[in-house]
Amino acid sequence: IDFEGRKWEVSAPEAVMTCSAVAYFFAKQVTEVLDIPVGLVISSWGGSRIESWMNEKTLASIDGVDIEAARSSKLKMHHRLGCMYDTMLWPVRNFTARGFLWYQGESNIFNYYCYAPMMTAMVQLWREVWEAPNMPFYYVQIAPHKYKDSQDTDAALLREAQIKALEIIPNSGMVSTADIGDEFCIHPPQKDVVGLRLATLALTKTYNICGLPSTGPTMTKVNYSEGKAIVTFDNASAGL
């Protein structure tokens, strides 16, 4: 990527028309709370697979991954191993960053079983590239949707893998979209809510702002009795 002649874009209607809505609302909220400018470096491609956001060495270190399939020339470029990493991440590595936001997963429900280790390895790689071993990594759990060409449980198992990754990746955080998904539209319209939830998470965990509800209800256990399931949640002091 050639950055010559490029400059930071000021937040204005003409600049944000093509900006990620989630990223915009995230930055807007953080700016308002901290009263400081927030810059966004947006490296994204709709529908990309996680394999495309890491290099081959990283992906090859993960058990259960088919490297040959991931590098296949039959794949779309944004699905192919290393493509997004080489073209959209590596070129911006010299920008100082405060943290990463990640909103992806829908294109990987077919291999949910290795998603948690793939995301863990990817985050480790990115932190090594930025020479920041504890850089915050906040991500969005995929929304409920009737995904085509998949088993009914695949998306739920991918969400479960995202929760598992939360337990493995240090200094990470996840926001849920379970209440704002759309069965028939893979792009839920309430991007402002997603951005606000990510901002609240960052304000709490990175900027140490107290008193914000930064985490949604999290199931901790289930007990079964007389044909009923009794579910216990954390982070639900105000109820579900």
Predicted regions and their residues:
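Cell-envelope and extracellular/periplasmic
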Residues: 1-240
